[in-house]
């Protein structure tokens, strides 16, 4: 009969509550000025190399994963430069027809140029006439709390993990409400103590007043 060996692993963690930030998203979505989604990129546009001639950002397919969305092929344009003729195969927005990208080759090209100022991220006020005058809204920080509970069952142990997503404003509001409730309780107790002390001082005075009224003779009471 084969020998059976059982092993038990003890899991212990001094910190059962840990906080995790959502961090930077791996993919970035960019939109046309009209609000149409046109590009999904694995990094920010600002991190891409810039072409000095027209300040266009360069996407190298060998280095960055990307995908074009809702984009149509536009006509080829020939531009006269000092060193020769530059040929551009342009791509426009499928909704409004705005020039967004261009390439130097029609097919099987690794390089795509993003036209300067043609794309915006979500929340930068796309769809308005003045995009760069709009104030960018800062995303709300979400606090993620993870609670780990370990249950010992002899040879085996089970770990239960639960997460709670809370917005920072909700957490601050709850903390303020708790502090107000605690202050109200303290004030209520102080008022109760003051009321009891006043009663204790008033009771002897009332007794003395009653005793003073009871003093006197029967003749005085008859002529009252």
From Swiss-Prot:
Residue ranges the record marks as coiled coil: 172-194
A GO term, aspect molecular function: protein-macromolecule adaptor activity
Record localization: Cytoplasm; Nucleus
Region (Disordered): 191-224
One GO term (biological process): endoplasmic reticulum to Golgi vesicle-mediated transport
Lineage: superkingdom: Eukaryota
Segments of skewed composition (Basic and acidic residues): 191-211
InterPro entries (UniProt xref): STEEP-like
Protein keywords: Coiled coil, Cytoplasm, Nucleus
Main subcellular location: cytoplasm
Record family assignment: Belongs to the STEEP1 family.
Protein name (database record): STING ER exit protein
Organism: Danio rerio (Zebrafish)
